[in-house]
């Protein structure tokens, strides 16, 4: 049985890790290098590193920070934010990333997924989708959740997987930062639509939320969170022990 993954997410702005609620009002949390090392040493299965200003302001990723994070950690690193071209993939991978997450860049140019999958392999291409309900329909938002694309989220995810995305991070804007649990309805719809690994993001507030996620939706491969880990509300080692007690397969 494939073990489930617990993945802390570092949202980085101006070289610091920040975490807002519903993408508004950012608080400075810490240094990405310090936090990355802490998670690598304390049970995280992977790390996700987003430059959250990159897509909106067209800013290139902070490659110096990225190199330091990659040198410091011993777990797989996924990097996103401002990935718009194959050159962006190349730059990030050369800095030590294992996987590259594409969001707004794929919305602008879906062929980017196909080109990157062909060049680097689909295991390297992660589709990140910010999804919000609009009139009861799961809708894709771009530019860090600020711009309604009008696209149906399930159809978009299916299209991108067909193009070569090897993994999907589904971030529910409705539940992000609210700490009332993952968006199970949205995640179930995605899991039913595609066969690649699905990572749940947005809404974790407690260990129980992860237990519920993996019990209710066995098809979900990983749970991703930021603030509950950054503020030490949930300890990853303890979380994984708790999940293992519930017979959820974990790498301890």
Predicted features and spans:
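Alpha-helix-loop-beta-strand connector modules within alpha/beta enzyme cores
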Residues: 57-78, 115-130, 180-205, 247-248
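Structural preference for beta-strand elements that scaffold enzyme active sites
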Residues: 5-9, 46, 74-78, 99-101, ...
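Glycine/small-residue-rich loop that forms an oxyanion/phosphate-binding "nest" at active or ligand-binding sites
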Residues: 53, 62-120
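Conserved anion-binding
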Residues: 12-14, 18, 97-170, 174-175
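Glycine-rich, proline-tolerant flexible connector loops at the mouths of alpha/beta enzymes
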Residues: 46-64, 104, 169-180
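Catalytic cores of alpha/beta
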Residues: 77-78, 83-96, 185-220
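Conserved, mostly hydrophobic/aromatic
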Residues: 11, 39, 47, 79, ...
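Glycine-rich phosphate-binding active-site loops on the catalytic face of alpha/beta enzymes
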Residues: 91-112, 172-177, 200-207, 216-236
């Amino acid at each position: 049985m494939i073990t489930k993954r617990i993945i802390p997410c570092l949202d980085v702005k101006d070289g610091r890790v920040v975490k807002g609620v519903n993408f508004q009002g950012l608080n400075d949390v810490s240094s990405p290098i310090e936090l990355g090392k802490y998670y690598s040493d304390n049970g995280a299965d992977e790390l996700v590193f987003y430059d959250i200003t990159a897509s909106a302001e067209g800013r290139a990723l902070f490659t110096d920070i990225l190199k330091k994070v990659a040198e410091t950690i011993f777990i797989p690193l996924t990097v996103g934010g401002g990935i718009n071209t194959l050159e962006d993939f190349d730059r990030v991978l050369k800095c030590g990333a294992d996987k590259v997450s594409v969001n707004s860049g794929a919305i602008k140019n879906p062929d980017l997924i196909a080109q990157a999958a062909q060049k680097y392999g689909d295991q390297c291409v992660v589709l990140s989708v910010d999804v919000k309900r609009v009139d009861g329909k799961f809708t894709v938002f771009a530019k860090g959740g600020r711009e309604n694309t009008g696209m149906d989220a399930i159809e978009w995810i299916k299209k991108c997987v067909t193009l070569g995305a090897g993994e999907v991070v589904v971030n529910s804007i409705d539940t992000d930062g609210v700490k009332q649990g993952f968006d199970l309805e949205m995640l179930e719809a995605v899991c039913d639509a595609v066969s690649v690994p699905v990572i749940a993001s947005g809404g974790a507030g407690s260990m129980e939320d992860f237990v519920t996620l993996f019990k209710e939706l066995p098809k979900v491969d990983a749970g991703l969170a930021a603030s509950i880990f950054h503020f030490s509300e949930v300890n990853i080692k303890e979380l994984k022990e708790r999940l293992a007690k519930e017979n959820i397969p974990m790498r301890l």
